[in-house]
Amino acid sequence: DKEKVAALPEEVERVHGQVDGLINNAGIIQPFKRLLDLDEAAMERVMRVNFWGTLHMTRAFLPRLLKRPEAHLVNVSSMGAFVPVPGQALYGASKAAVMLLTEALWAELQGTPVRVTLVLPGAMRTGIAEEAGGEAPRAEGAKVPVLEPEVAAKRLLDAVERDAFRVLLGRDAQTMDLLYRLSPALAARIVQRRMAHLLT
């Protein structure tokens, strides 16, 4: 709700006195369906929560952050922003938009008190798939450790402490990031082969 978001900074300042940081961590996935099988409402909801929610929260709080001696903006994207997952075209697009938005803000805010960190998590135990009406997806033939939220939160805070530009959470995210840099087509093919069963 854009209007409620616009009113949020004043409410937070009234309760807490000041805002020194913002972590945009809202995210939902789409049902595991091909693009042409998705209805408009599902597509719009994914973009509204994942991208527009992050954008509106950032625009609402950034003026306050810029007035602080030091402040930090953290946007949580996803490994799905750079590695395409079958049945998650809209989710990937929304998180790719968050990734590029965050990288652009990092550049725009150089020379200001606001530091910016981009977070790219891999598989985490969050219940996001169950919220979308399905089971947690598992890659065929893969034993990928799932990151616990508490571990991810600690690593995120460590990244903020050292003013990291970009942090990959989880061994899967780190591996796929390296592979994607070496060969985007190969990385996409590996994910497609291991995740294609989700669409059958």
Kindly label every feature range from the protein language model:
Residues 1-7, 40:
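The beta1-alpha1 cofactor-binding region of Rossmann-like NAD(H)/NADP(H)-dependent oxidoreductases
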Residues 78:
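Residue(s) in the substrate-gating loop at a strand-loop-helix junction
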Residues 36, 85-89:
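Active-site loop immediately N-terminal to the catalytic Tyr-X3-Lys motif
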Residues 107-171, 189:
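SDR active-site lid
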Residues 58, 94:
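Active-site helix of classical SDR
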Residues 11-22, 31:
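A glycine-rich helix->loop->beta "capping" turn
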Residues 33-35, 42-44:
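Substrate-binding pocket helix/loop in short-chain dehydrogenase/reductase
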